[in-house]
A protein has these predicted regions:
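Short helix/turn-capping signatures at newly exposed starts of structured segments
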Residues: 1-121, 131-133, 140-175
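Minor-groove-contacting beta-hairpin "wing" of winged helix-turn-helix DNA-binding domains
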Residues: 125-127
Length: 175
């Protein structure tokens, strides 16, 4: 198992937005093979025993990114853009907060013409793009989490919320 660094580590904002744009601008629906190709084009390595798992620069051997699929169509992707620290310290907390703010500002700046709506939840911001792709960035106690949701999953989640089937805010707070 890869040992966690004492300090929080994250991609610089230019690398972060390169990853976000690649996923946001990709055509949808996306097959699992296309997702693997996209991950690998961004420098992530496929995890041979489980093709839906991927390894970022932050991990030597352990998968830290993944896709979910249904009928060979990608539903969402969790993309590692940081490596969690092993302890919560004031320095790590400040660095995580600053990085999260920088990432949010970069999305707002670089994707401003693509954003249809945004929703701020506790320690989370969700941007829905005009193409239906959903970007969720979450500030956690030891790292930052990036999820990309396919247009199909974005539509399903919105329909569930409109029918009041679940409260995603409460679920996300537990992450």
């Amino acid at each position: 198992m890869t040992q966690r660094p004492a300090r929080f580590e994250a991609y610089p904002t230019d690398r972060f937005i390169e990853i976000v744009k690649a996923w946001a601008n990709h055509h949808w629906p996306m097959t699992s093979a296309e997702a693997q190709e996209l991950y690998e084009s961004l420098g992530y390595r496929a995890y041979a025993p489980k093709p839906e798992l991927f390894i970022s620069d932050f991990s030597q051997t352990d998968p830290d990114s993944y896709i979910t699929t249904h009928s060979d169509r990608v539903g969402d992707a969790r993309i590692s853009v940081s490596h969690p620290c092993n302890t919560v310290t004031p320095q790590n907390t400040d660095t995580i907060s600053c990085t999260f703010s920088d990432y949010c500002a970069t999305i707002e700046d670089k994707l401003k013409d693509m954003i249809a709506r945004r929703k701020r939840e506790r320690n989370t911001i969700r941007w829905t793009l005009h193409n239906g792709v959903d970007i969720r960035l979450a500030k956690l106690s030891k790292n930052i989490s990036l999820f990309i949701e396919s247009p199909r999953m974005t539509k399903l989640r919105r329909e569930e919320q409109e029918m009041d089937l679940t409260s995603y805010g409460e679920i996300l707070e537990d992450d």
